[in-house]
């Protein structure tokens, strides 16, 4: 049970959050608990959705974004986000079980994606303090400056969702995947 009350329906959410939750429902077909939880703060929900939707139009493929989410969620010990991104990774990004395991371990079986995931892991663990060599390795794998910045933003976005879900102990509404690590 969540430590912060989660509106059970869109109509239970604050008035300013309702159109945002309706948009989530149109996009996903359902409104996952995390979105309903965050709707307690309409400005937080608006900010999250703005960044989420902007990044979805970026240069990184959806599969790479899901790989990063899995790696960061494992680092931060967020079972809610691991559950959500395992589900989304399989259903939307078509990631298989060996790939998801590799992502949770901070790697990828795809050579180019591996560079992005490893860079994201360094960013998350070192709180942004990456070496010149680590940035060069990312670029050598074919990533642009814009994509490097997007990777930073995905790490930040996923860290935020990890923190909010761990703080609130959001009830998991996906097939449950337990984090191996606790932050």
Residue ranges with predicted function:
Residues 1-183:
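Hydrophobic alpha-helical segments
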